[in-house]
C-alpha cells in the first residue's frame, strides 16, 4: 500500500489520539494534498513547524499501529466478512433466498 494512503488510513483510525492542531495539519497534508507552504500559510505557522508536526505525527501513527494493530485487524475483519458473504452466495436457492438475504444484510450492516 502506498505510504501516503496508509498514513491517511492511520490518521482516520488514530486521529483522536492527536491534538486538534496535529489532526488539522495531517488532514491538510494527507487528505487535502496541500504543500507544506500552503499548510503553513493556512495555519499561520512556519513551514518548518508544519514539517516537524508531520514527521512527529507520522512516527506516532506508525507507533500506534505497531502496538495496537487496529488497521490490520480492520483489514482482517473485512476479508473474513467478504469470505462469509461469498459462502452465503454459494448457498442460494429459491427456497432460502429470503433468509440468506437477511443474513447477508445483517453481516454487511452490523459487523
From Swiss-Prot:
This is UPF0122 protein CKL_1400. It comes from the Bacteria. It holds the Pfam family UPF0122. InterPro entries: RNA_pol_sigma_r3/r4-like, UPF0122, UPF0122_fam_protein, WH-like_DNA-bd_sf. Might take part in the signal recognition particle (SRP) pathway. This is inferred from the conservation of its genetic proximity to ftsY/ffh. May be a regulatory protein. Belongs to the UPF0122 family. The lineage of its organism: Bacteria, Bacillati, Bacillota, Clostridia, Eubacteriales.
Amino acid at each position: 500500500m502506498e505510504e501516503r494512503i496508509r498514513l491517511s488510513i492511520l490518521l482516520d483510525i488514530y486521529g483522536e489520539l492527536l491534538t486538534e492542531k496535529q489532526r488539522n495539519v495531517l488532514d491538510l497534508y494527507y487528505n487535502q494534498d496541500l504543500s507544506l507552504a500552503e499548510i503553513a500559510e493556512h495555519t499561520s505557522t512556519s513551514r518548518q513547524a508544519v514539517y516537524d508536526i508531520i514527521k512527529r505525527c507520522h512516527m506516532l501513527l506508525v507507533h500506534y499501529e505497531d502496538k495496537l494493530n487496529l488497521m490490520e485487524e480492520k483489514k482482517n475483519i473485512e476479508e473474513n466478512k467478504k469470505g462469509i458473504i461469498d459462502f452465503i452466495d454459494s448457498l442460494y436457492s429459491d427456497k432460502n433466498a429470503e433468509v440468506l438475504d437477511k443474513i447477508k444484510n445483517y453481516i454487511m450492516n452490523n459487523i
